Amino acid sequence: MAPKVFYISDGTAITAEVFGHAVLSQFPLEFESLTIPFVETLTKAEQVKRQINDCFITTGERPLVFHSIVKAEIRDIIYSSEGLDYDFLNTFVAPLEQHLGVSASPVLHRTHGKANHGYEARIDAINFAMDNDDGQTMKHMDQADLVLLGVSRCGKTPSSLYLSMQFGIKAANYPFTEDDMDNLKLPDALKRNKKKLFGLTIDPVRLHEIRQSRMENSRYSSLKQCRLEVKEVEMLFKRERIPYIDTTNHSVEEIATKILDVTGLERHMF
């Protein structure tokens, strides 16, 4: 039976999920998880406590409880459950108070709330990524922080969206298609913004597998075409001295982190 995990917060539960996932990913196990956000009242906290206790009674195993709860009275109710408790905020707040010599002044939803000064910047970045996805337009390249280049289905769109959502980076992306291969070159709008360009490549066999699931047995998905496109685009990257990375078997989080590391782009944390 898969171990049971609860992610609980009086906010969005994003922090609890990220922390919990990071810890549990160290173990070669499958976990069955439940996320419960916005536990903002004592009544809701008691309901969650009963869920945790019922899980313990049913399975005979204490469920893992990762939480980031600001309100002490709600946190105390979760503490009193039969779950194995991992309190992200309290673990770090007390030592930081001692080190900084300042008492914490918890404000609910401060990290992810709309009142945060970076909210508008993040929304602008997300809109920019969607408006400038897959070479839809070249009019806004001058406004981009980053322009991702690569063959179709190499990870450009998810990487652009992740960078915009997580770090407020205005990331456009531009695809090189089958029609470009005979005379592969940078469009003028990209040449003008060459310092913003970053390439993504991928193993041709993996690209073939991805494209097969989209357009099976087509020229677009053939291994021969995939090899040709990857070879030509990598040659362009080298010729134009555009930095690039291989996305094969890497998660979007890993790809984004590598891009930031190579480019030195500033992360805007929200």
Curated annotation (Swiss-Prot):
Keyword Cell cycle part of the UniProt annotation: no
One Pfam family per UniProt: Kinase-PPPase
EC code(s) of this entry: 2.7.11.33, 2.7.4.28
Reactions that this protein is recorded to catalyse: [pyruvate, water dikinase] + ADP = [pyruvate, water dikinase]-phosphate + AMP + H(+); [pyruvate, water dikinase]-phosphate + phosphate + H(+) = [pyruvate, water dikinase] + diphosphate
Primary enzyme class: transferase
Top-level taxonomic group: Bacteria
Keywords, comma-separated and alphabetical: Kinase, Nucleotide-binding, Serine/threonine-protein kinase, Transferase
Binding site for ADP: G150, V151, S152, R153, C154, G155, K156, T157
GO terms of molecular function: ADP binding; ATP binding; phosphotransferase activity, phosphate group as acceptor; protein serine/threonine kinase activity
InterPro entries for this protein: Kinase-pyrophosphorylase, PSRP
Role of this protein: Bifunctional serine/threonine kinase and phosphorylase involved in the regulation of the phosphoenolpyruvate synthase (PEPS) by catalyzing its phosphorylation/dephosphorylation.
Similarity section: Belongs to the pyruvate, phosphate/water dikinase regulatory protein family. PSRP subfamily.
Entry protein name: Putative phosphoenolpyruvate synthase regulatory protein
Organism: Shewanella baltica (strain OS155 / ATCC BAA-1091)
